[in-house]
A protein has these predicted regions:
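Bacterial N-terminal signal peptides
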Residues: 8-18
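Phosphate-group recognition and catalysis centered on beta-loop-alpha active-site segments
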Residues: 21-291
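Bacterial N-terminal signal peptides that target proteins for export
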Residues: 1-8
Length: 291
């Protein structure tokens, strides 16, 4: 075997050894997207959320803020679609309890012969005691019912009410509203805040277009974000794309809760983000080499 061949073999063996010794993504950094559905208990239901939190997984959950200051772990758009319109932020606790997450969109009458389990949106306070012992928990604020200053104050007040011993260190707030991230940082200086990115756009000049990493980095820096939760788009959100975000100083969540496709195990392994979304966390963990 000549010199170049020996060198190539040595490099190949070193790479293989590094891969074999590298730890898989930690369980707590694999984020169950809106929980882990169980039977007829759908995503965002209490059983689904508990399955993620009690299982040692991370969680990425959409949040609906209501004007009375409550926080429900469900997307505002989901609530509006089930009710066939309306502003989810205006619902009272009684009205929110009347929303069945198993309900077909706009169908308020199941019929006498149809049995469907009833699961209403879950208030943050119902799962708050489970969060400190879970993996990393990302709360994506899916609506902003008021000025960003008012909403930041609302979030601070609600956190102080439900987390009696202080906001858990494993809790992260996510938003696509830059001013809200800034205001949250002002209200709660120790709170981790991630910029929510859907790297697709449309305008009259470009038509449909994909947003490149430098633009995402520019925005996240302006918002003083700690990290970036980016929608996974195969062929666009590549390892090189993720690497640029990381080299700019941001932690990265691969996959955006409630938006687009979940990243594949191959994409997660190649990109090496700090966190990854999954509909089936156990399957992703196993595919990444976890036991």
């Amino acid at each position: 075997m000549n010199g170049p061949a020996r060198l190539a073999l040595a490099l190949s063996l070193a790479f293989a050894a590094a891969v074999a010794q590298s730890a898989p993504l930690a369980k707590g950094n694999i984020l169950a997207a809106n929980g882990i559905p169980k039977g007829e208990a759908p995503a965002s239901s209490l059983p689904a959320l508990k399955a993620a939190l009690n299982g040692g997984w991370g969680l990425a959950a959409n949040v609906t803020l209501t004007k009375d200051g409550r926080m429900y772990l469900v997307a505002a758009g989901t609530v509006s679609r089930i009710l066939k319109g309306g502003d989810a932020s205006k619902l009272t606790p009684e009205e929110m309890r009347g929303v069945n997450l198993n309900q077909r969109e706009g169908d308020l009458d199941f019929g006498d012969d149809e049995v469907v389990d009833y699961h209403s949106p879950v208030e943050l306070e119902k799962v708050a005691p489970l969060i400190p012992k879970a993996g990393t928990v990302f709360l994506h604020l899916s609506n902003v019912p008021g000025s960003t200053e008012a909403v930041a104050a609302m979030v601070k007040k609600r956190f102080s009410e439900v987390f009696k011993e202080g906001t858990p260190t494993n809790l992260v707030v996510v938003s696509n509203r830059g001013n809200l991230l800034i205001d949250l940082g002002r209200e709660m200086p120790g709170l981790k805040r991630f910029h929510y990115v859907v790297p697709r756009g449309h305008n009259k000049v470009k038509g449909d277009f994909l947003v490149e990493a430098p633009s995402v980095i520019y925005s996240a820096k302006g918002y003083k974000a700690d990290g970036i939760m980016v929608e996974y788009i195969a062929g666009h959100i590549t390892p090189a794309y993720v690497d640029k975000l990381k080299k700019a100083g941001f932690e990265v969540v691969l996959g955006a809760v409630g938006c687009g496709a979940m990243p594949t195990a191959d994409a997660v392994a190649a990109s090496a983000p700090e966190y990854a979304l999954a509909k089936d966390p156990a399957a992703l963990y196993k595919a990444l080499g976890g036991k």
